[in-house]
Amino acid sequence: MMSAASTNPEFPIATSGTKDIVLAFSGGLDTSFCIPYLQERGYAVHTVFADTGGVDAEEREFIEKRAAELGAASHVTVDGGPAIWEGFVKPFVWAGEGYQGQYPLLVSDRYLIVDAALKRAEELGTRIIAHGCTGMGNDQVRFDLAVKALGDYQIVAPIREIQKEHTQTRAYEQKYLEARGFGVRAKQQAYTINENLLGLTMSGGEIDRWEAPGEGARGWCAPRSAWPSEALTVTLKFVEGEAVELDGKPLPGAKILAKLNTLFAQYGVGRGVYTGDTVIGLKGRIVFEAPGLISLLTAHRALEDAVLTKQQNRFKPDVARKWVELVYEGFYHDPLKSDIEAFLKSSQAKVNGEVTLETRGGRVDAVAVRSPHLLNTKGATYAQSADWGVEEAEGFIKLFGMSSTLYAQVNR
């Protein structure tokens, strides 16, 4: 354990009296460790749990009781569902791109957690914020950059601090808590788990060892043996690129996504093993599950394909990839992100209509699209009939390929 006399400016020690500190708390191993660790260094720890849609009522109650059990001076739970829909899901779906073409940015609720923590700090009159991020991952970058962008705060990162002296930090945290009479849930011992409205990620254990994930590394998505035998079909309605109805029923966006999570998780949709480049240059490997978000992206992309022009569909992914990179790398409050979102919002003006999704397990397909803005021609059907003549088609082909034809003629 680190000495209370540490002078590391990143981890200030309250040596006289008690200072209020706000801890972004999830009830997991890392943030559970943070409470007694900070208390023993002279802090009154006020915990904030931002409920961004990954827990049920029973789990919320557990988190509240866990904070009290560990000795938190106060605890508040903040409803982050509407904020995560407006602040992340809408622009992410408009962008339609995963990080490095795969990962759907499932821990982007970190920025909303920061907002909740800073609001609580303002209520308490303190400028000291703590989080349970490690010194090797991306979350520390997202938390710290978001806090720095929003004001002059002191950031305390206990897990990052103990990693200077302990290589097996999770084992150390567990022993630390058990030595003080606090139990640790079994799954917390093996994996780092993040859950929210967007989906679920797991790391640790065999995942970090580049081995096949065991059955314990499974959260929402049912295994193949448990998939229903009947196909699932749902219809989503979009207005200006935003999902507003599910199967004909108007619902708030966050509730639509929550229902899609439940429906498509039964069929194992949206589960993957992802290896990518982290912000700090390491390779990161996780299991992720995002049944609702993947289904929503599939429907939205099908509608865009049908109503946007060829040039829009060609150009938008380039801009979208930059937006995804900014969010992934911690630049959530950079003005370029807002600039890109203005373009993405503009591109959605005609993205209106209904899309029917279908799954029989493992993947989801958009099987029907209806929109008043479909870019089809009454007199033309792809590869079958058209309202232009053969001569017009031949002339178009000649002009369209003129540059390549001339090059070939000159260089034969």
Curated annotation (Swiss-Prot):
Enzyme Commission number(s) from the entry: 6.3.4.5
Amino acids binding L-aspartate: 134, 138-139
Pathway given in the UniProt record: Amino-acid biosynthesis; L-arginine biosynthesis; L-arginine from L-ornithine and carbamoyl phosphate: step 2/3
GO CC list: cytoplasm
Entry binding sites for ATP: 24-32, 50, 132
Keyword tRNA-binding on entry: no
Domain of life per record: Bacteria
Binding site for L-citrulline: 103, 108, 138, 142
GO MF annotations, alphabetized: argininosuccinate synthase activity; ATP binding
Gene Ontology BP term (one): L-arginine biosynthetic process
InterPro entries for the chain: Arginosuc_syn_C (IPR048268), Arginosuc_syn_N (IPR048267), Arginosuc_synth (IPR001518), Arginosuc_synth_CS (IPR018223), Arginosuc_synth_type_1_subfam (IPR023434), AS_cat/multimer_dom_body (IPR024074), Rossmann-like_a/b/a_fold (IPR014729)
Listed Pfam families: Arginosuc_syn_C, Arginosuc_synth
Reaction it catalyzes: L-citrulline + L-aspartate + ATP = 2-(N(omega)-L-arginino)succinate + AMP + diphosphate + H(+)
Keywords from the named record: Amino-acid biosynthesis, Arginine biosynthesis, ATP-binding, Cytoplasm, Ligase, Nucleotide-binding
Top-level EC class as recorded in UniProt: ligase
PANTHER family: ARGININOSUCCINATE SYNTHASE
Subunit annotation: Homotetramer.
Record family assignment: Belongs to the argininosuccinate synthase family. Type 1 subfamily.
HAMAP family: Arg_succ_synth_type1
UniProt-recorded name of the protein: Argininosuccinate synthase
